[in-house]
Amino acid sequence: MAGSKQLVFNEEARKSLLAGVNKVADTVKITLGPKGRYVVIDKATSPIVTNDGVTIAKEIALHDKFENMGAKLVKEVAQKTQDKTGDGTTTATLLAQSMIVEGLKNITSGSNPIEVKKGIDAAVNASVGYIKTTSVPVKDRAKIVQVATISANNDEEIGTLISEAMEKVGYNGLISVEDAKSLETSLDVVKGMQFDRGFISPYMVTDNEKMVCEYEDCSILITDKKISSVKQMIPVLEMVASEGKPLLIIADDVEGEAQAALFLNIIRGALKVCAVKAPGYGDDRKAILEDIAILTGATVISEEKGMKIDGVTKRELGQAHVIRVDSEKTLIVGGRGEKKAVEDRMTLIQSQINIADSEYKKEELKKRLGNLGGGVAVIKVGAVTETELKEKKMRMDDALNATKAAVEEGVVVGGGITLFRAIESLDTLKFEDDRRVGVSIVKRALEEPIRQIAKNSGIEGAEVIAKIREHKNKHYGYNAKTGIYEDLMENGVIDPAKVVRIGLQNAGSIAGLILSTEVLITDFNDEKDQKSAAIII
């Protein structure tokens, strides 16, 4: 039988959601801009000092279950923005809060929630159109440095390193961020490849915050077989465990008792292992597995060759400097295969490209060639303390993701100016019903980033907005870093268009959802929960 449930309705439901939204957003928005503050998060090992919006938001859980629903919804804004762009989470959270606060005021005064939501959607779409039309493609190193520097909280060292990394491996190349063994932060290019297969289970994650599995000095078992028996795996697991080395398993699948045994030993801490399904299909899969084997110095354990997993020796395992696996992809850095073998394999693939009879086949072969020949830029981050290292790596990751977003969709003027100037594009939306309320809610929200950046810099937001409004130059704004009003685009204050666009869309989506909510339902715990005005069933 299901347990008791608590229900709240109408205005009370929306107020509870708003309280949760405000507690998350008020904590996160103090970090916005170059003068934003830091937040210290208590951890079991050592505290984390950060100004990263999504990292802060993820740590917040509220005692009141109804308020916690609102907190979870606005945390989703930050997380979705992070997942798609890697940056802009604070702005997205701030926009969502503003839309929800203004929306609830109007709905309480009698506006129709559904029509208000339609107005918000229309205004967000019009603003996105403006963002796309003002975007400038990224074609030079200076823009890369500017984007990366701003996303790294104005750390020019990080901006320069990311720019150099992109120069070495290309705009779409692979870039990895690792811990340095010294205090210095450095850049190196090593052999590596990436393929589109993630871990078979979250049990294998080593970093719960980033949801990735990462191991250094890792052995690699490659097979085209399904692994279902524990017995066939025991020899290879004992071999790597005796050396204290982690193991990456690339197989057709790992299932049944073999999978259960891996999970149990990972949880107990007896094994450091990650398993992924082999990339590709059919004959392509066999060829890709052979590519990985040559890059890492492994031998593919194949039934066609009469080989068995329980007979694997150390010689047949590949080796890599670092492996990093998330839910969607696997990155192998510093494969220790022989250089001559890799070159011979690339020559073979090139000859296959030359005689391929279809464009599809040529493209697939070119991808394989790029994977084998393309290096991975490794940025090794150094710091004096563990706390400083974590914070610096977070900023490095933010900057890297923002820079990739800038390469994809270009850049727009930063400092909140693009969103502010998008307000003019909403004047064309003429509605006679409550949709116009939704449009006015978005107009107000689009001012909030400037107001908050100004507030975090110790000046009045309304004063900054008034000065910006006086100027016809669409790039004119307040540079919070220098305290000067100037052309922000010319002076390198820019944002990736993709970050601004997705943050606004996610904020509008969650705001519309909360504003049209009428009922909240949550579990009722007789021992812990106090009876309130909520209905209990």
Curated annotation (Swiss-Prot):
It is found in: Cytoplasm. Its EC number is 5.6.1.7. One of its GO terms (cellular component) is cytoplasm. GO terms for biological process: protein refolding. Gene3D superfamilies: GroEL, GroEL-like equatorial domain, TCP-1-like chaperonin intermediate domain. One of its GO terms (molecular function) is unfolded protein binding. SUPFAM superfamilies: GroEL apical domain-like, GroEL equatorial domain-like, GroEL-intermediate domain like. The keyword Chaperone applies. Keywords: ATP-binding, Chaperone, Cytoplasm, Isomerase, Nucleotide-binding. InterPro entries: Chaperonin_Cpn60_CS, Cpn60/GroEL, Cpn60/GroEL/TCP-1, GroEL-like_apical_dom_sf, GROEL-like_equatorial_sf, TCP-1-like_intermed_sf. It comes from the Archaea. It catalyses: ATP + H2O + a folded polypeptide = ADP + phosphate + an unfolded polypeptide. ATP binds at T31, L32, G33, P34, D87, G88, T89, T90, T91, G415, D495. Together with its co-chaperonin GroES, plays an essential role in assisting protein folding. The GroEL-GroES system forms a nano-cage that allows encapsulation of the non-native substrate proteins and provides a physical environment optimized to promote and accelerate protein folding. Forms a cylinder of 14 subunits composed of two heptameric rings stacked back-to-back. Interacts with the co-chaperonin GroES. Belongs to the chaperonin (HSP60) family. This is Chaperonin GroEL. It comes from Methanoregula boonei (strain DSM 21154 / JCM 14090 / 6A8).
